Every structure is written in structure tokens, then in C-alpha cells.
């Protein structure tokens, strides 16, 4: 059996880091099991689904390193769903209902008042053909419910009916179908809710494992029943915990700041986003994996906590810095060249500055420091200005190397009596225009004698 998984986003908005957790969990599970990954757009809501969102999702996944083996659109498969509807109708498992939302709400309140579970009472099953015709003559159109197998022979005599599965994340799970309403599969206008197309596609596409958020745990009992009603063996299920904001709020497509696109535009590395999305809320330590192969080594569905995990942007910042600070030159080289950073000193420059980067784009500012002019003259006090001028008069001739800074500052210390911060800070400001940054022993060689002299205040 070939392991086949799917990620099925609705292209009604941009995906966020919570969606990324689901996509990457499926991708890594397939990768570790030599399986297949299907990207399936749940675009049955044709009015809200937009091609621009579908394209954005594809771009976001590609940026993260997720490359589907197959791409499908549910909007192109309505004829397949129609056949499944007819099959369920013929089997007596899909029945027409005519209640309005207000009528259903009144019935729900009445059941609660009688201390009964607020589930649908299957009143529509009692309608005669004449009563249905009369309702349709009034202009009502039916919606269609799936008849859950929670009874022996009388659908009005429901009984405890347990559905069991061994969850890849949560272990043995049980759902009682008697506590649920028969789900609506087809709306009044003939469009489909999520449930039926999802099950039909999973069957048709040979999906063997469904990995998704634990907000779908209850749905699983219903979906297993539909799989069986359509004559299929249910796949293996795994439900990971959900990500929330620091304040505990659920993530949504309206949380724009946490969309994958916004994180990319903010300069985060894809592996920083991927590492946090996968490792947060697990028993694994949250560390930055340099690539997908390394992340796969730490990926284990069984290690995921059953409690929700809070997404802290500061953790993402820390992971991003870790990746940049340890990034080898060969990996950074193409990106440096794209920024015009190349030549004989590119490698030594990268090794000098990488430990001070929060974002890769910060590298351009440091390249300007070592190869261009400072944006503005450093703000030095009169005493510090005189000190720096004296120090610059003591600059040794080239060639310079890694020991030049030490020998120069020792000479300056002897000549001026300054030491520690009082010596180094004015020189740093004069050389770089910044109060903090890479080791000056490394930068001085990169700046060179002539450019250093040009910065004499």
C-alpha cells in the first residue's frame, strides 16, 4: 500500500501558520513513508472561492518546500459527488428535509426544555409524498441529511452507537453517533457542504491517511459512517492539536499578520516557519531545522500534545536568527549574489556578519558598511571626535589581517590611555555608524585602509 495523504484548504483566503502545521504534517508523513501528497482545493463554495487565493496557497506551499504530487479542484468534480448522492438516496441513507433555520431553532429549544439532547429529531422522515409536494408548492426546496446508523430498525429509537478508531496522535478514540444530528450533506440550492465531497474524494483518490486539526475529531465518527455507507474502508486518522495566539484565540484567515505570505514578506526564513509550525506543542524541543530532511527526523505524530499550542512570534524570531547565524556560505551565496554581494571578500563578509542578522535582508546594510559610504556621519562628542582622529592617525599600513584590529587598538590604548568601552565604542561608531554589530576585528579587514581613512571625522 502506498501511503497517500492530502491537504485540502478552502481558497477563500490566505493560509496561516496553523494551516501550515496541517500541510507540513501531511507532507512530512508522506515523505517519511515514501508516500504521495495531494493538494486538493476545497472550492465547492464557488462564490467565496477565488483563483487568486488558490494561486497564493500554491506559492506559500512551494516557499515552504511542499511540492504536491497531484493537484485537484473539487469544483471540477461535481458529477462524481452527484453519483454519490444518488447512491445514498437509493440506499435510503439520504433524506429530504424542509425545515427553515427558525423552525430548527425552535425545535432545538423545545428539546432542551424537555431535557433531551439538542439533536435533529428526524421529523422529515415522517413526511408523506403529499406533504413534501405541498411544501415544495410553497416554494421550499429540500436540503438533504445523511441518516446516521445509530438505531437498529426504528430511526426514531436511537441508541448508543460507538464509532472507534485508533488515532495516530490521540490514540484510541470513541464517538457516540446517538449524540449527533444527522448531518446535512446537500444544501437547498444543491451545493455541497464539506463532508460529502471530502469523503468521496478520499475514496476516489485512494487517500490512506487523513491528518488534520483536532477540531475535526467529532466529525470523524460521521465521516467513518459515510465511508462505510459508500462501500469503502475508512482511512487512518490523526488529529493534531491546534495553534492559538498568545492570548489563546484561535487562528483564522482573518489573522492576517500570521498568514504565510505576510511572514514571508516580513523576512522570515521558510525553515523557521516550518520548524515552529511542526515542533511547537510537541515533546520535541523547538529548534531550527536547516532543511526538510532534518525536520523530518524530529517529526513524530505521537509526540504531539493533546492541548493546544500557543504561537509566540518571539520564538519565530529566535528560530530565524538561529538559522541565519549558522547558515553556511554556500547556502547563502546565491542569495548574496542576487543582492549584488559577490567577489573575493563575499565569503569572509558573510562569516563576519551572519551572527548579527535578524533577517537575511539585513545583510545589505552591512555590505554598505564594508563596501560603500555610511548613510550619515556618526554622532561623536567633541572629546570622542578628537580621540578617533588621533586613533586614525595610528592606523597601520596594509596588508591587514585578523590581527590588525588588536595591534591597532593596543597602539591606540598606549597612546591615549583609553581602554574598554571608552576605546572601542567611538571606534565602532566611526567605522560602522552603529553602536552594535559584528566583531570589529573582522570588519576592519573588510572595510580596508582607504575606506577606513575616509571615515576619519
Curated annotation (Swiss-Prot):
Pfam family, one: Anticodon_2
UniProt motif 'HIGH' region: location: 9-19
Positions of ATP binding: 253
Signal peptide: none
Domain of life: Bacteria
Compartments where found: Cytoplasm
Example GO biological process: glutamyl-tRNA aminoacylation
Annotated keywords: Aminoacyl-tRNA synthetase, ATP-binding, Cytoplasm, Ligase, Nucleotide-binding, Protein biosynthesis
EC number(s) given by UniProt: 6.1.1.17
Substrates-to-products reaction catalysed: tRNA(Glu) + L-glutamate + ATP = L-glutamyl-tRNA(Glu) + AMP + diphosphate
Root EC class: ligase
Motif 'KMSKS' region per record, residues: 250-254
Location (main, coarse): cytoplasm
GO molecular function: ATP binding; glutamate-tRNA ligase activity; tRNA binding; zinc ion binding
Role description: Catalyzes the attachment of glutamate to tRNA(Glu) in a two-step reaction: glutamate is first activated by ATP to form Glu-AMP and then transferred to the acceptor end of tRNA(Glu).
Subunit structure: Monomer.
Family: Belongs to the class-I aminoacyl-tRNA synthetase family. Glutamate--tRNA ligase type 1 subfamily.
Family annotation (PANTHER family): GLUTAMATE--TRNA LIGASE, GLUTAMATE--TRNA LIGASE, MITOCHONDRIAL-RELATED
Record-given protein name: Glutamate--tRNA ligase 1
The species this protein was found in: Brucella canis (strain ATCC 23365 / NCTC 10854 / RM-666)
Gene: gltX1
